[in-house]
Structure formats: C-alpha cells, structure tokens
C-alpha cells in the first residue's frame, strides 16, 4: 500500500477479490449446468493468470484493486466449476466422495497456507513477486485441464435463452449486502453507515424481485427448485453458519496470537498451520466413514461437535500456553471442518437433479461466503467497539454458539446412504 501510495484503499485489495468471487459463483455454477464445465474451467485459469500478471505490474492502488477484481471473477468461476466437476465425472456418490475430499482439501489448504506463503515471498522478494507465482501454476493447470478433462456437453439447455435479468438481480442480491458488510467493518464505520445499510436493503430488494422473475423464465439462472426440499434449506443454513465460524477463526486467530499474546507474525502463522493442514485428514476420514453410514448426517453432527469443542478450547489460550496445546486445539477445529465442508456440497448434489447440480453446488459455496462476511463483520464491529481482546473472546463465544446450532440443524437433516443414491 505504501509502495503505491494508497493506504486508504488497502482494504479493498482483498475486498475487491472477495466480492467479485462471491458474486459470480452462483452465476458461473449455473452456466456450467447449461454449457458445460470445461470451457469455464479453462477461462477461469486464463483470467486468474492474466489478472495476477496485471496485478503484479500495477502502478497505483486503483489499478491493483481493478486487477484483483478481475482475479476474483476468475476465482469465482473456478470455485463454481471445480466443486461441481466430480458430479459430472462420477455419478456414483461412493466414487465421487473421494474426489470431493481432494477438491475440498486442496481448497482448504490453499486458503490457509496461501496468505502465509504469500507473506513470506513478499518479505523476501517484494509484493510484486507474490503475484508472479500464480501465472505459472495457472499455465500448468490450463494445459492439464485442456488435455485430460473431458468435454461433457449438457443436452437439457440446447437452444434456450440466457436469463440476463435474473443474472443482474442475482448479482445485486448477493453483492450489495456483502459490500455493505465490508463497509461496516471499515475503520470509519460511521462515515459509511448510511451507504452500508442502503446496500443491504438493495440486496434484499433485488432478492425479492428475483423470485418472481425466476419462476417465469424457461431456463432460470437460479432455479428455485433446488431449495424446495427441507434438507436443501437446512444444508445451506448450516453451510452459512459454518462459513462464519471458519473465517472468524482464519481471519482473527492470527490477530489473537499476535496482538494479544505477543507472538511474531511468523510464529503465529506456523501455529495456524494445523487448522488447515488437518482439514484433509478429517475429509479423508469422512470419505472412509460415509459409505458405511445408514444415517450419513451423523457425520455433520460429529463435525460440528469437533469444531465447537475446538472453538471452546481456544478460549483457554494464554500467552503462556504450550505450543503442543495450541496445535492440539487447532487440529481439533480443522478435523471438524474436514467432516463438514465436503459433505455440504456432496449432500446438495445427492438431493438435486443432475441438470441443477452446478447451481446447487455453487449455492453452498455462496452461502459459505455470505457466512464468512457476516461473521467477520460482526466480530470486527465488536473489536472496534470494545477492544481486541474482549472482541475476540466474544467472537469465540459466538463461534461456539454457531457450532451448537449447526449440530442441531444436522440432527434435523435426513439423508439416505450413498450406496442407495
């Protein structure tokens, strides 16, 4: 920010990416249903790679924000397609769950380790170097996807017009409240309060207008039928709350370790590693247990218990807490997330029509993004109004309560065994 003389706009470097990604997940998930995943996967890799190069070449802060938004568009497209691709390739849920584990684990590890590795590269080589790493990975991924990923052409959307009005309303319905929440956690909240509330109201208004529009069009961008079942509503509500817990921990635990307990940024980053490193282990255990469950929703209950226990034990941390204890507690939270995150997507795919599987999967990811924005905003407001220490403690209590609610919701979900799906 100092290098580009734009400290006042610094927060929007991350916010711009997040908003662009969250807004587009649902739209690109549905477009994948209509036109196939492979073109969108290739386009997402190209956009992310080009956006990274342009961001690294930015000469001022507005340019950097604009190119981060471009990256976010590619990121949203990537999330929407990669989480749905296993459903196209493996109609059998027993085989699909293994690949869902790999996808979810890769995403979780990248989300946790990416910022830490980026910080190390920035410290060693400068901030521009952090952006020049991604294009190389994007080129390799583009080649592998182009050569080996099959082109599966949907047949149910042939000749039907794209729902442009629904796409616009959906963009406002998702993006406006998220932008409002981001403004609420800005430093000068009072200066933005009116605009933030206006954005939230605009988002709800667009959502209300979206419903009758989607009921009328032949091929809706957001098919309302994916929310007709009780289970789909409960799964997305649980995903919303879990997203809040996950990002409160990822976003604010480093602040607790550094500002309250006095750890160095490097030490705090290393202590956070178990949270994301153990998620794949939980996902692999989930993949082994899931086919054996007559009531697979019990794994959601197990995940919420582990996650809630980890949040509760996090409140025991002090400046004198031994490293092994911090690792055990954060590993417990990571294990819980490993049981929750892949199952939300898999269960939504299991109860949705094949023609809607992209929209259903994308909805889960969007709800997680909404939950993360809401959770981090509420804790951010608590920190701003009280203090860092007290605000973080309130945030952890909030996480425990959310985990209890997720556990209760999970008991109300009734899923059939994957062997029968």
Predicted regions and their residues:
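Hydrophobic alpha-helical segments of secondary membrane carriers
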Residues: 90, 100-106, 165, 238, ...
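Hydrophobic alpha-helix/TM-entry signal in multi-pass membrane transporters
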Residues: 41, 48, 64, 100, ...
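Short helix-kink/termination motifs in transmembrane helices of multi-pass secondary transporters
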Residues: 8-11, 15-16, 20-23, 37, ...
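Cytoplasmic-side transmembrane-helix entry/capping segments in multi-pass membrane proteins
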Residues: 43, 96-106, 159-168, 227-228, ...
